[in-house]
Swiss-Prot record:
It is found in: Cytoplasm. Its EC number is 2.1.1.186. The keyword DNA damage does not apply. One of its GO terms (molecular function) is S-adenosylmethionine-dependent methyltransferase activity. S-adenosyl-L-methionine binds at S194, C227, P228, G229, G230, D246, D266, D284. Monomer. This is Ribosomal RNA large subunit methyltransferase M. It comes from Haemophilus influenzae (strain PittEE).
Amino acid sequence: MNKLALYCRPGFEKEVAAEIADQASHLGVFGFARVQDNSGYVIFECYQPDEADRLARDIPFNRLIFARQMMVISGLLEDLDPADRISPIVTAFEELSQQVNFAQSSELFVETADTNEAKELSTFCRKFTVPLRQALKKQGWLSAKATQKSGQFLHCFFVKPNCCYVGYSYVDNHSPHFMGIPRLKFPADAPSRSTLKLEEAILTFIPRKEENKRLNENMIGVDLGACPGGWTYQLVKRGLFVYAVDHGKMAASLHDTGRIEHCAEDGFKFQPPKRKKVDWLVCDMVEQPSRISLLIGKWLLNGWCRETIFNLKLPMKKRYQEVILCLENLAVMLAEQNLNFEIQAKHLYHDREEITVHIALKP
């Protein structure tokens, strides 16, 4: 068990490779990444046996920015017989189970990468899931409750119709979503599809049980670069009153809610109204990531907000390095003022050439 598989958006394999190598080295684990451009996944191979399992346990999944899923895998199973793919797959799982007790496993995902080529396998994967699940249950696996907070999910990752990896992820340190992708439905009354970015960010960064406490009708938000209102929509839907800052027009449907005030100003120059306590700042402006980072830092240091979600648009080259630089600079700015804070960042499914960052100031 010396291999990890990590899913990602196609085109971001090098960023995942750099990130997993960094995170592994912090734990004293070393290896190399197998990268195929635009494949939608990376295989990280550790130099020492059993270290992949350690990484899957000890690298906090929520600290990985570019990875959608992280799991320990077998070697590649090749030339599977179309008449009986299940037997060698079960055998591979049995080998993994010598090290990990799959009696605590609760779910099976038969998956592909998120590419057009791989998606051609999606119908096969869906049909194959039922007989494979039955075969694994005969081994005494997949019997744990889906709501448990420990144990594993089992994964069968097909790269071709006759080639797959089998593996597992830890329930307390993975994405619970199939292929690592949350399925969100576009609201018919939302002004733009960008609304899904903020919805996914809220679901990713804020625990469900805390959402009503941290986003509610007693709060005020500011949306910088708000037009036409995709992000404002998500705040208004949760009851917030929003100052929507943009020279462009906002959707009439948002004005009709009575929960927004349109401020036709430059997002970089806008300051919150005096005697108003702003709880949330959101920002999805197309600008250099370093400039956005400074803007967000200014809001937090001035006490203009307590919590923020914003996007950093990525450069064409050295994307991982630029992200780390921006996040480190923000952390230094806040730490120098003795602020207690939490930073999370993720390349969300609904992001493209950008990442989404969440910062919360703590008491």
